[in-house]
C-alpha cells in the first residue's frame, strides 16, 4: 500500500512540474470595461468606413462625434458636444451601458429618446484607445445603404470639462 501511495504521489508531482503547454491556447487580449475609467473623458478622433481606414469621415457622421464620459462602476454614460461641452442627454445621449460577457459587444440603453438600444461591436478598448463599430445608413441618411463605421476615441485632455447628469 505504501508503494502504491508513493507511486501515485510521484506521478502527481511529475504531472504538476511537467505540465504540457499543448493544452494552453493563446488568446487575444480581451477589452477591459474598466479601461473606460482610465480617462474621465474620451474624444472622438476618427470615424472611418470598413475597408477604408485611411479616410476620416467624421464630418459625415456628426451624431457619433463628441466627448463621452463612462462610469463603469454604475454602468452610466453620457455624450457631449465637442465644441461646447453641452450635454446630448436630452437627445438620447445618456443612460446605461453594458458589455457582454464575451467582451465583444457594447450595448447602450438611453434614458430618453426614441431609440431603446444601440448595439455596437467593441473593437478595441484599453487606456489609450476606445474603438467600436456598428452598421448605420451611409452618411446617417435614412434610406441610404448600410455601412459599417468604426468610431475611434482617445482620452480627452482639452479645456472642456463635463460632468454626468445622473
Q: Model-found features: residue ranges?
A:
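Bacterial N-terminal signal peptides that target proteins for export
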Residues: 1-8
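Bacterial N-terminal signal peptides
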Residues: 9-18
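Lipid interaction determinants
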Residues: 22-92, 104-166
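Extracellular/luminal ectodomains and secreted, surface-exposed scaffolds of diverse proteins
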Residues: 93-100
